[in-house]
Amino acid sequence: MKTFFVKPKIYYGRNSLAFLSTLDVNRVCIVTDKMMVKLGVADKIKSYVTHTVCTIFDEVEPNPSLDTVKKALAIFLDDGPDVMIAVGGGSPIDAAKAILYLSDEISKQIPFKRPLFIAVPTTSGTGSEVTSYSVVTDTERNIKIPFTDERMMPDIAILDEELTKTVPPTVTADTGMDVLTHAIEAYVTRDANEFTDMYAEKAIQAVFTYLPRVYRFGGDMEARGQMHLASCMAGIAFNNSGLGINHSLAHALGALFGLSHGRANAILLPYVIQFNAGLCDGTAAISPAAKKYASIAKMLGLPCSSTEEGVISLVAAVKYLQKVLDIPETLAAAGVDRKELDDCMSFIIKSAREDVCTAGNPKEVRPIDFTHLLNWVYEGDQ
C-alpha cells in the first residue's frame, strides 16, 4: 500500500498576501531575517495584520543555527501567538518549523496551544512551505541537521510572486537549481509513485522553461510566478517520496565550505545522475533509476533512442543549464580547497551516510562510492 499526503492549503498568485487581512486573531509572531526587514517585506506582512499585537523576530541567519532557534523559541513561548508567519527564503521557514516542533515537545510538560502556522516564501527554491522537513545548523559540530516531522507542516502557504521580484540573479539561479534537484531526486527515489511523479515532472518542465528567462530578466513576472509554483510542486513531490544523496552531500558540503544549498546541489547533480543511473559501472541498461532519468529526457524532447542515451542527454541538459546560469561545474571551480576537502572527506562521508535523505537514494552507496564521487565532483570530467 502506498500513501500520498497533501497539505497545506495554498493561496497563490499576485496579491494573495491579502488573505492575511482576513485573519481574526489577537497575537501574531513573524519569523524572518534582517534582509526581509530592510526590504520592507516584514512591514508589508505586518500591514495586513494591523488589528493584532505583532512581534517580529528577525535574527534568522542564512543557515539557521540551533542557538538562533532556541533564542526565538524563548520569545515565542513568552509571546504565545495565535498565528506564526514565517517570511523569507528556506531559512526563516525552516527556523519557524524548528520553533514549532520544539514548542510542541515542550507542551507535553507545559500547556501551550499550537498557533496557526503560515509560510510565505520569498524565493523559489526550497519548497519548505509545503514540506515537513527542516534543516538547522549545529555550529558547535559544524554540521547541518535535516529532520522531518508532520507537526512541522505549515497550515497555510501563500505564494505571491511579487515577493520574489527583488531576488538577485545569483540567488535566483541557485534556488532554481534547488527546485530542479528536488524534482529529479523525488522522481527517481525508492518511494516515488504516480502522484509524486506528476508533480515532479511538472516542476522539471517549468525549471527548464522558465529559470533561464527569470535569470536573464528578473522582471519577468510570468516566469517568476511559474518558478514559484514549480518550487511548491517539487516540495509536494519530495515531501512524499523523499530525496537522495545529492541532498545528503549538499548538506555536508554546504555546512563545511559555505556553499549555498542550491549551488551545492547544482554542482553535484550531473555527477549524481550518472552515478545513480549506472553509467559509471555499465549497469544503465538494467537500472530502474536510469529508466526514470531517460523518461525525463524524453519528456523534455531530448535524444533518447536508448536508456543510456536518455541519461546522457539529461546530464548534458543539466550542464547546459548550469552554464546559462553561470554556475561552476566543479567544487574546485566553486572555490573549495583540495586539501580541506581531503581533510574533511571522512567527516563528509559519515555525515552523508547518516543523513535522512540517503535512505531514499535509488542506488546503494558504499563509503568508497562516496569517495570516488566527491573526487569526481571536485575535479570534473578529465
Whereabouts are the PLM-identified features?
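Gly/Pro-rich interdomain helix-loop hinge
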Residues: 263-340
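A glycine/threonine-rich phosphate-anchoring loop and its flanking beta-alpha core
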Residues: 8, 101-194, 288-295
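Glycine-rich phosphate/pyrophosphate-binding beta-alpha loops
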Residues: 125, 232-265, 355-360
